Amino acid sequence: MNLMAQFTYDLNPVDFIIADAVGEPGKRTFYLQARAGKQSVSLVLEKQEVNNLAASVLQLLAELEEKYEDLPPIAHAKKVVYPEQPVEPSFRIGQLLIGYDEDTDRIWLIAKALMVNEEGSVIDPDDERVPSARIVTTRQQMYTMSEHALEVVSRGRPICPLCGRAIDRLGHFCPRTDGQAVPIIL
């Protein structure tokens, strides 16, 4: 089976992977970027998707440590990885799958683009026209990516303790106060 025919981008194994953001808080664009040799890919995600990916990876790593006690430990020292600039998105992620290959001790991600047809309906991610990427990493690379991703997500605007919405620099009118409170301004 020709895997390159299955994936628009097939990065196996990657030299680096990072989840990061560009722009000012409140207007940031979040992305997942990976490189293998001369091939690189930058994939756009939402902030919450980056957070969910990082949390899922850390949960998977914990489960793997429990299940496979003989796996080499992950170093918890932070390795600095910098994204390639400029960030040129290949596509916006519509579907993201994560898995583990115990034979190679590698974690893989399969990302499929979010595409819509002329009528505005979402195209099935399994449609052969939908761009996709396979990213194969070490457990260490995914740990480092996840720790950095959580740090990047936390750099955003503070969250209102009452309604859970982001507080803008210009102020925040919380719907939970029903207009009866002074706006929160940072």
Language-model regions: role of each:
Residues 1-186:
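Positively charged, low-complexity terminal tracts
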